[in-house]
A protein has these predicted regions:
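P-loop/Walker A NTP-binding region and its immediately flanking N-terminal helices
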Residues: 1-161, 179
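Extended, largely alpha-helical regulatory/partner-binding modules appended to the mid-to-C-terminal parts
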Residues: 73-76, 92-95, 108, 160-269
């Protein structure tokens, strides 16, 4: 994983790469944005780059030093992750804060990634705040959330805030094309457009729907098969209704709407 592999967040990843290159790092970062746009992935890439012993000129991790190898092999003792959705008690935070006292063994920093940080209990937030107010010099926190408004203002004020954008449809389509070519999957561009629209700005959702469509279509993703698999109403139906209305064919409109309802769609939408 590299910063360049993060889709649709170029300005944000450039800023993070520049921070790695300059060595001017904050003690706390807050990554905000909708689900599936790369917050946790970016946090991991950033954490690895921060501790890389020989970062590239572009601010990417070298993937060759001991710190990078340890991270890639999931045996790093300097990068910790906590899923606050399922570990949100004050005891969980206190256990994590105990780790901040021990300096890093390999690399420059101990990096703590707390995902879904808004799920922490009030007591846990208060316990975390004590460390955040006066963090050890060797500690960096990267917090990720989909609901920034639920985080205490005293926490937010101590973080550098990065707002992740929703994926655009063209960005999603371009990435899905790359995935399709890599996997040897053929596709119709209209089909990828339907998948991108269905993902609602989330790359993770887009990839999940893409995998589902690829399985259903047996490696040849077509528009007709995708709308059938995803139960999406064909756009031609809308045009047909408009044409019939312009021709004052009320009876035909009712027949078409009835057929749509019989397929399980809600005529009101």
């Amino acid at each position: 994983m590299t910063f360049d592999s993060v889709v649709g967040q170029a300005a944000l990843t450039t800023t993070l790469k520049n921070a790695v290159k300059s060595g001017k790092l904050a003690h706390a970062y807050l990554f905000c944005g909708p689900r599936g746009v790369g917050k946790t992935t970016c946090a991991r890439i950033f954490a690895k780059a921060i501790n890389c012993q020989n970062p590239t000129a572009e601010g990417e991790a070298c993937n060759e030093c001991e710190s990078c190898k340890a991270f890639n092999e999931q045996r790093s003792y300097n990068i910790f992750e906590l899923d606050a959705a399922s570990n949100n008690s004050v005891e969980n935070i206190k256990a994590l804060m105990e780790q901040t006292r021990i300096p890093p063994q390999v690399g420059k920093y101990k990096v703590f990634i707390i995902d879904e940080v808004h799920m922490l209990s009030t007591a846990a937030f208060n316990a975390f705040l004590k460390t955040l107010e006066e963090p050890p010099a060797h500690v960096i926190f990267i917090l990720a959330t989909t609901e920034k408004h639920k985080i205490l203002p005293t926490i937010i004020s101590r973080c550098q805030i990065y707002d992740f954008e929703r994926m655009t449809v063209p960005n999603i389509i371009n990435h899905l094309k790359m995935v399709a070519e890599k996997e040897g999957i053929t596709y119709e561009e209209e089909a990828l457009n339907v998948i991108a629209e269905k993902a609602d700005g989330g790359m993770r959702d887009a990839l999940s729907v893409f995998d589902q469509a690829a399985s259903f279509c047996q490696g040849n993703i077509t528009y007709k098969k995708v709308i059938e698999d995803l139960n999406v109403l064909d756009a031609d139906n809308y045009f047909n209704i408009i044409d019939l209305c312009l021709e004052n064919k009320a009876a035909d409109v009712m027949v078409l709407l009835n057929n749509i309802i019989n397929k399980g769609f809600d005529a009101a939408t």
